[in-house]
């Protein structure tokens, strides 16, 4: 643990000097507090809805970042370190109920290509765990998994797969974090949803569906649910759909993840 803390301190200093910590790589105001890298957590975790204290928890002497890494999300973080270190194939990831897309990030030094961070996506004072891509994140800031605490236990709320991908979004004007969910049922049926986390679950704020099976000549629909049933959605033209999708993709936000190469 001492070795990890020393490495973390060095890494934090480098990030502070070169990039500034905890902000998306898009332009973000300096007072943005929605994202905090694993190296930056210096305040104690909130006591509201905190994991049930055990004797081991009470005696824990690490700082907040260590607590979330070593206790709260220990298993979720560790399993990706194991998989990346051993360079599992897609099937092994799926067998362990993990994102198979991580298997596409082994170029060069695999442990440098994937990392994790903590964010308070729903503003309740409890950090969610985000595991995502570092490699090529400026072009495709893919999120592999998002974990939240629900009833004091870690619960997976998002996982990218071969036909569905998640991305973090940051709306600078509103100082608001959200999540984009891109899903495909094939070339004739696909959608992009914009989500807000609340009480450990995602709520749809808006979505755009392309469904040529429902209407080949006018396949675009605005939706506010994820049931894929466009009969209760609003038909829109292609120009409107393109505008909504462009606005959503323009605020995709790459994170300054703590790389797994520095995890151990």
Labelled PLM ranges:
Residues 112-121, 165-178:
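Beta-propeller blade termini
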Residues 1-10:
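Positively charged n-region of N-terminal signal peptides that target proteins for export
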Residues 22-27, 31-34, 41, 50-84, ...:
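Acidic, small-residue rich beta-repeat scaffolds with periodic aromatic anchors
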Residues 17-20:
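C-terminal motif of bacterial Sec signal peptides marking the signal peptidase cleavage site
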Residues 123-133, 173-180:
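Acidic/hydrophobic-patterned starts of short beta strands in beta-sheet-rich repeat architectures
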Residues 55-110, 155-165:
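Blade-edge motifs of beta-propeller repeat domains
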Residues 140-159, 195-198:
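Beta-propeller blade repeat segments, especially FG-GAP/WD-type strand-to-loop junctions
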Residues 138-142, 186-189:
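Short, solvent-exposed loop/turn segments at conserved positions within beta-propeller repeat blades
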């Amino acid at each position: 643990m001492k070795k990890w803390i020393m490495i973390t301190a060095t890494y934090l200093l480098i990030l502070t000097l070169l990039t500034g910590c905890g902000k998306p790589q898009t332009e973000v105001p300096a007072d943005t507090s929605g994202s905090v890298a694993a190296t930056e957590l210096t305040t104690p975790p909130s006591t509201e809805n905190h994991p049930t204290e055990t004797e081991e928890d009470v005696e824990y002497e690490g700082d907040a970042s260590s607590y979330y890494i070593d206790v709260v999300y220990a298993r979720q973080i560790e399993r990706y370190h194991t998989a990346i270190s051993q360079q599992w194939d897609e099937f092994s990831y799926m067998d362990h109920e993990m994102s198979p897309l991580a298997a596409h990030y082994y170029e060069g030094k695999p442990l440098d290509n994937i990392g994790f961070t903590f964010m308070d996506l729903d503003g309740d004072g409890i950090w969610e765990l985000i595991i995502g891509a570092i490699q090529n994140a400026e072009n495709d800031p893919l999120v592999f998994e998002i974990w939240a605490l629900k009833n004091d236990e870690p619960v997976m709320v998002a996982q990218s797969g071969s036909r569905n991908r998640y991305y973090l979004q940051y709306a600078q004007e509103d100082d608001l974090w959200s999540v984009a969910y891109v899903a495909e049922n094939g070339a004739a049926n696909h959608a992009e949803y914009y989500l807000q986390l609340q009480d450990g679950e995602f709520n749809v704020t808006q979505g755009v569906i392309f469904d040529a099976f429902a209407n080949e000549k006018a396949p675009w629909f605005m939706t506010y649910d994820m049931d894929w049933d466009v009969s209760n959605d609003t038909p829109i033209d292609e120009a409107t759909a393109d505008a909504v999708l462009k606005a959503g993709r323009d605020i995709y936000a790459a994170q300054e993840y703590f790389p797994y190469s520095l995890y151990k």
